[in-house]
Amino acid sequence: MDVSALSETTFSPAEWINANYKKFVEENGRDDSEAASAFIRSYVAKLQLYIFNVNNAVEESSRQVVASMPRIAKESAALQADVHRLQEKMSAMRLEVAAVQSETGECMATLERLNTKSQKLQVAKESLQESDGWGNLLAELEDGFERNDLKGVCDKLIALQKSLHAQEQLPGHAERQTQVEDFKNRLEALASPSVVQCFAEGNTEQAQHFVQIFTSIQRLPQLQQYYRAVQKNFWQQQWKQTLELQGTESQPQQQQFLTLYYDQLLEHCQRQVKWCSNLFGENSPQPFLVIAELLPALQPTRDAHILQLLKTSNERLEMLALFAKVNHSFVLHLNSLLEQSHITLSEELHRLLGEAIFEYFHKFIQQYPRLEETQLSTQVDRLSSNQATPSDGVRHLEESTRKLYEWLKEACERCASITSDLALCKLITLLNGIFKRQLESFGRIQRQIGLSLGSSSYAAQSENWSLLQYTMSQLQCLADFQVQLHQFEQDLHTRMVMLSNRLTKPSNRGPITIFQTCDHAARTQLLNSIADYQQKKSEATDSLGIFPQIYATLKSHFADTHDITLNILLQPIETHLAHIRPPVQDHAASGIEMPSFSFAPQESITQIGQYLLTLPQHLEPLLLSPSSLLKQALEVCNIKYTQAIPCADVLLSLVVEQCCVLYVTQILQIKSLPSSAATQLSVDIEYLSNVLEELGLSINLQLSQILTLLKAAPDQYLTLSSGCEPRLVTAIRQMRNIISTQ
């Protein structure tokens, strides 16, 4: 029997019996009731026997457990007693250990005091012994100095230093220390001529010998100072020779003095880096410290000599750009040398070296804006010339705008090359004046066109399309100026962002740059100016915040030029309207009677209509497919040009709108209007309305209301005038002499 299934958690008696029965049938080949009964009897008997055995096993296990319980309880009690005894022993041992520690601690303290006293006694003994030999050492030192025995003096001085250290606890230590320092000074004075000579000759063997001597007497910094003094004296002489040599050359050659000197200095520095590494140890910064101390102390100073050259030069900006380039080239090679030699400069030396190279040039950076303004003003003044005709003036504006922005780009390039953009904000300030001077030229041409419009030569012509072409060209030129100004502003913002990043970069890391030499006040002022321009950029709508006044002036020029355009187109209309203008005074006062009009449109009105009908054919060549610049200019002048309709149609609508306004003004000047005159006037207005309908336009609301009021019968005037402007209702009623019934 497989009784293992009985212990499973999912045991099913029926399934278990059926499975065993199937196995029985397969083994015996019988499947009848008798076989089933026999199988069941056999399995029941086996199960009963199995259960009986299990019960016996359980009873036997229970009996054994009950029998062993007293023994387990006895053993547990014994174990508990043993644990209690162990705890008592551990407590007693802890007390014994504490007592031993207390006793040995006092003994150790006593031993330490004895050891300290022993050491002090030993030091005192040695001090007394050294004190006895101190006088002998002093005498031997004096003897060595008399014989100029440098090596002997050095050895005795080393021994004297050891003796001084040994006598540190004895009285009179300060006096002995002073004596040692005096001997060191005398030794340094004794060695100084030889030190200077060996450094001047570059004698490595002797220099190493002196390094050992000065290191032994703790005077290595003084030896390094001798090294720097020799180097600086040599290069000061080289500086004077360079200036004298260049002074005999031509002016272009004289400007190369700084390049020549820096090249020699770099070549020498490269050799000295290796020499000092062998002499003073790896990564010795002494050659770079020489440069940091040498350049500010040069006589005559670099800035004084450059100023002298600037006074005799007519190309000052080019000369400053040359010297700025020399500075940057020198520092570039110096940074490369630092990187190749793996020398890390201290923060202080890093700062001093940058100031030594660039600080003298900051006064020229401050002078740069004034020099740049002078040059730009001179260039712009050459452009400012009065032109004989408007056509010449407009062509001159196109050329001058192109040249102006070329000069401005060159000025920005000079600002970057000379000042590394440190004077960029000051350059922006002076550029406002340059732009204003250029915009004055636009104003002059506008006035010239306006005067040409009113002159007798042009007044005789009813249609002057040449002036219209000039105004369109000027609008296009203004738009070109605005587009280039916007791009120029964008370039300036990009440069200011780059400048801000360079100024905020930590100055004690990375290569040496001119930006680390800006003093705190100038740096703060520059960053504040850049932040102010960025703030204005975010707040501005028409510009990028750098030249808002220039944009405002430009907008005014756009409007003025567009007004001139309208005036050109309206001049024939005004001329025709002037011919039909009724008298201002009353007929009774003047004694003049109005003529008896026919009911056909007057000639002046028909001439206005014919002129308006011919306008599209004149405007379309100019505005049918305007350039992007002209389209932009027109959109600035009037928002209607932004609509998805041809610019010619927009301009025509503006002319018609102004024509209606002028016509209304003429009508409102009439004092009295008989019925026949009112009928004639209404016929004229209807004719004008029909003409405008052919153009796809209409008369304005005021003229339409006047037409309604003119056609209204006196008895229906009040009713038909409902919805019209009260001002027009009153004016027309008075003209027609209609008695108010209100």
Curated annotation (Swiss-Prot):
GO CC annotation, single: Golgi membrane
Keyword terms: Golgi apparatus, Membrane, Protein transport, Transport
InterPro entries to which the protein is assigned, alphabetical: COG7
GO biological process: actomyosin contractile ring contraction; Golgi organization; intra-Golgi vesicle-mediated transport; intracellular protein transport; male meiosis cytokinesis; protein localization to Golgi membrane; retrograde vesicle-mediated transport, Golgi to endoplasmic reticulum
Compartments, as annotated in UniProt: Golgi apparatus membrane
Function statement: Required for normal Golgi function.
Subunit and partners: Component of the conserved oligomeric Golgi complex which is composed of eight different subunits and is required for normal Golgi morphology and localization.
Name this polypeptide is given: Conserved oligomeric Golgi complex subunit 7
Species lineage: Eukaryota, Metazoa, Ecdysozoa, Arthropoda, Hexapoda
Name of the gene encoding the protein in the UniProt record: Cog7
